[in-house]
UniProtKB/Swiss-Prot annotation:
Region (Interaction with IGF2R cytoplasmic domain) residue spans: 500-693
Family: Belongs to the VPS35 family.
Source organism of this protein record: Mus musculus
Summary of the tissues where the protein is detected: Detected in striatum (at protein level). Ubiquitous. Highly expressed in fat tissue, testis, brain, kidney, thymus, liver and pancreas, and at lower levels in heart, intestine and skeletal muscle. Detected in oocytes, pre-implantation embryos and at 6.5-12.5 dpc.
UniProt-recorded name of the protein: Vacuolar protein sorting-associated protein 35
Keywords, sorted A to Z: Cytoplasm, Endosome, Membrane, Phosphoprotein, Protein transport, Transport
Residue runs in coiled coils: none
Gene name, Swiss-Prot/TrEMBL: Vps35
Length: 796
């Protein structure tokens, strides 16, 4: 039978299993011999056990498991030897003896184990033995075996390295300098072995080797952790000895993987205070790293860490003598210069980190933030970038960069102080400019930032011009209507934040805003001009409030209404009708209420403009009814007209109502007109209501006549009920022309017609309306109000 091929994983498991079994057998024998005090035999079994670490067949992961199993067993040997030496056994002989082990791997592991026990028993030998051990380990140059051997050396000597604060005879026991030299040498040798791994084996296994190297990196990094744990390593020693030694090794190894990992390791394991004192050498080293190293990530990690340190409430902050921002700014520029092929998005990422640093460490220094933006503009100019596509990585990073000042200051006026914010904004393509403009305006609205001067209005409008005017690079096809409406509504809401405490300044602000919005095209102005008109009306009311302090207030009001008139006229030119009609009516009301010199003429002009729009521009019957109802309602509220002006306007309303196309619309509009002759007011009667009962009756009779002409029975009855309600209203207002007899006749007419209607949901509604009307009359008849009319003789 042919044997089945094993997978590499199964092969590894089998090899590891066999090695572990051998370790168990040899360690069992070693322990038996130790229990019988047969030390030489025990060392022979230990040597056999360690012989398993000579293999080249295991993967790093499997080798690590084997190494851990053997380390545990060696610990047993170390404890035994420590006890023996405490009882007076000679260590020196043993230290000499294990050097005769046949193979170098077992020999060095045993030497380290015995050497550590020797140092614990005779501290005066520490300096020589440590030096001896770290040098002897050079005997193993196979990368995997050498790395684990040196890791064993580092772990075993962890508690015996000389450090600060312990009584020592420096000649023999060594001091902190010896510890630093020991770990730095071990680190350098381990790094060389680790780097050399990539050159072993066939080139087709390169990816696999890189993965294995990634798995082993922590062994090299442990040296740096060990250095950071030495209490004797203060800022001065770190600067002069430790960092210099590490950086020399990192830069000289010319291996991208090692450089990137070790630089990040330095940032992580040493304290922030050390980094602050060694920024320049560290960042200079960054500029010298291999071209394939992602320097951006290293620098960003350091910046972010120091920014957090500066921001800590319980921390000491950044010392005044350390110009943190300047150092990073200069060194980042050097790094970018040294890497011509650095991707644009990485360059911008570095600026993002710099701006974060400026914001967190120097919140008051707007100039630092602007310096970062200026540098970015210069870089883009060199790269000849323009209209950066929304989908690109550069655009995403640039968006991050520009959002930081917006989000941190939460005040657009501070952002406007950044001279290079707008120039950088212009590098975006149309889509990105639009979305960033929305982002900026949303921030203004969220934080209610008031814009108080013309210059500020100009600056913001220019910044977000993509939302306000057509752009040369905008797409040919029309935007999505919903999105467009959302964007323009944002702009419309923003207008309400254009407000100065000084009314004259406010007028200039509105004028400036109109210049920008006026160029927005027909699609935009329907959203942007109405709020501007309302802001103008509000300003006129402010002048009225301040009339005691400003003797020219009336002329200024006239100017404002002229401004509003021009602005509304722009909407008419854009072929809009209903919107300008409403704005004219609102203006007429405002002018009448404020009562400045000439206000009647202004109000009359605004009313007649509304009429012209109604007659010339509105053709849809539904829209016509809505418009004439609005005109009548507005006019009824006004009390600034003399009879000379009031009479033609109310007559015009009645005429327009009777000319509507559809009979039901005519009936409703004419009955609404009745109110003008009752509660309308003019100056001739000192603002009192007209109470023209006869004219009211004429309107209501005309409405009934029109209702009679309707062909649809349901609609006819519905109109009768509506007109009945009008009659009741005027009867209760004590209009003598409306009598109980009139009410009885109309109720009787409705009662006769209702049963003839076809059964439907609509008929049900009509019945309900009529029933509610009768209920109202019944309750009034049964409990008459003391001042109200008496419903005597009403037939229900």
């Amino acid at each position: 039978m042919p044997t089945t091929q094993q997978s590499p994983q199964d092969e590894q498991e089998k090899l590891l299993d066999e090695a572990i079994q051998a370790v168990k057998v040899q360690s069992f024998q070693m322990k038996r011999c130790l229990d019988k005090n047969k030390l030489m035999d025990a060392l022979k079994h230990a040597s056999n056990m360690l012989g398993e670490l000579r293999t080249s067949m295991l993967s790093p992961k499997s080798y690590y498991e084997l190494y851990m199993a053997i380390s545990d067993e060696l610990h047993y040997l170390e404890v035994y030897l420590t006890d023996e030496f405490a009882k007076g056994r000679k260590v020196a002989d043993l230290y000499e003896l294990v050097q005769y082990a046949g193979n170098i791997i077992p020999r060095l592991y045993l030497l380290i184990t015995v050497g550590v026990v020797y140092v614990k028993s005779f501290p005066q030998s520490r300096k020589d033995i440590l030096k001896d051990l770290v040098e002897m380990c050079r005997g193993v140059q196979h990368p995997l075996r050498g790395l684990f051997l040196r890791n064993y050396l580092l772990q075993c000597t962890r508690n015996i390295l000389p450090d600060e604060g312990e009584p020592t005879d420096e000649e023999t026991t060594g001091d902190i300098s010896d510890s630093m030299d020991f770990v730095l040498l071990n680190f350098a040798e381990m790094n060389k072995l680790w780097v050399r791994m990539q050159h072993q084996g066939h080139s087709r296994d390169r990816e696999k080797r890189e993965r294995e190297r990634q798995e082993l990196r922590i062994l090299v990094g442990t040296n740096l952790v060990r250095l950071s744990q030495l209490e004797g390593v203060n800022v001065e020693r770190y600067k002069q000895i430790v960092l210099t030694g590490i950086l020399e090794q990192v830069v000289n190894c010319r291996d991208a993987l090692a450089q990137e990992y070790l630089m990040e390791c330095i940032i992580q394991v040493f304290p922030d205070e050390f980094h602050l004192q060694t920024l320049n050498p560290f960042l200079r080293a960054c500029a010298e790293l291999h071209q394939n190293v992602n320097v951006k990530n290293i620098i960003i990690a350091l910046i972010d860490r120091l920014a957090l340190f500066a921001h800590r409430e319980d921390g000491p902050g950044i010392p005044a003598e350390i110009k943190l921002f300047d150092i990073f700014s200069q060194q980042v520029a050097t790094v970018i210069q040294s890497r011509q092929d650095m991707p644009s998005e990485d360059v911008v990422s570095l600026q993002v980190s710099l701006i974060n640093l400026a914001m967190k460490c120097y919140p008051d220094r707007v100039d630092y933030v602007d310096k970062v933006l200026e540098t970015t503009v210069e870089i883009f100019n060199k790269l000849n970038l323009e209209h950066i596509a929304t989908s690109s990585a550069v655009s995403k990073e640039l968006t991050r960069l520009l959002k930081i000042p917006v989000d941190t200051y939460n005040n657009i006026l501070t952002v406007l102080k950044l001279k290079h914010f707008h120039p950088l904004f212009e590098y975006f393509d149309y889509e990105s400019r639009k979305s960033m403009s929305c982002y900026v305006l949303s921030n203004v609205l969220d934080y209610n930032t008031e814009i108080v001067s013309q210059d500020q209005v100009d600056s913001i409008m220019n910044l977000v011009s993509t939302l306000i005017q057509d752009q040369p690079d905008q797409p040919v096809e029309d935007p999505d209507p919903e999105d467009f409406a959302d964007e323009q509504s944002l702009v419309g809401r923003f207008i309400h934040l254009l407000r100065s405490d000084d009314p004259d300044q406010q007028y200039l602000i509105l004028n400036t805003a109109r210049k920008h919005f006026g160029a927005g095209g027909n699609q935009r102005i329907r959203f942007t001009l109405p709020p501007l008109v309302f802001a103008a009306y509000q300003l006129a009311f402010r002048y009225k409030e301040n009339s005691q302090m400003d003797d020219k207030w009336e002329k200024k009001c006239q100017k404002i209404f002229s401004f509003a008139h021009q602005t509304i006229s722009a909407l008419i030119k854009a072929e809009l009708a209903e919107l300008p009609l409403r704005l004219f009516l609102q203006g007429a009301l405002a002018a009448g209420e404020i009562g400045f010199e000439n206000h009647e003429t202004v109000a009359y002009e605004f009313m007649s403009q509304a009429f012209s729009l109604y007659e010339d521009e509105i053709s849809d019957s539904k829209a016509q009814l809505a418009a004439i109802t609005l005109i009548i309602g507005t006019f009824e509220r006004m009390k600034c007209f003399s009879e000379e002006n009031h009479e033609p306007l109310r007559t015009q309303c009645a005429l327009a109502a009777s000319k509507l196309l559809k009979k039901p619309d005519q009936g409703r509009a004419v009955s609404t007109c009745a109110h003008l002759f009752w509660s309308g007011r003019n100056t001739d009667k000192n603002g009192e209501e007209l109470h023209g009962g006869k004219r009211v009756m004429e309107c209501l009779k005309k409405a009934l006549k029109i209702a009679n002409q309707c062909m649809d029975p349901s609609l006819q009855v519905q109109l009768f009920i509506e007109i009945l309600n009008r009659y009741i209203y005027f009867y209760e207002k004590e209009n003598d022309a409306v009598t109980i007899q009139v009410l009885n006749q109309l109720i009787q007419k409705i009662r006769e017609d209702l049963p003839n209607l076809e059964s439907s949901e609509e008929t049900e509604q009509i019945n309900k309306h009529f029933h509610n009307t009768l209920e109202h009359l019944r309750s009034r008849r049964e409990s008459p109000e003391s001042e109200g009319p008496i419903y005597e003789g009403l037939i229900l």
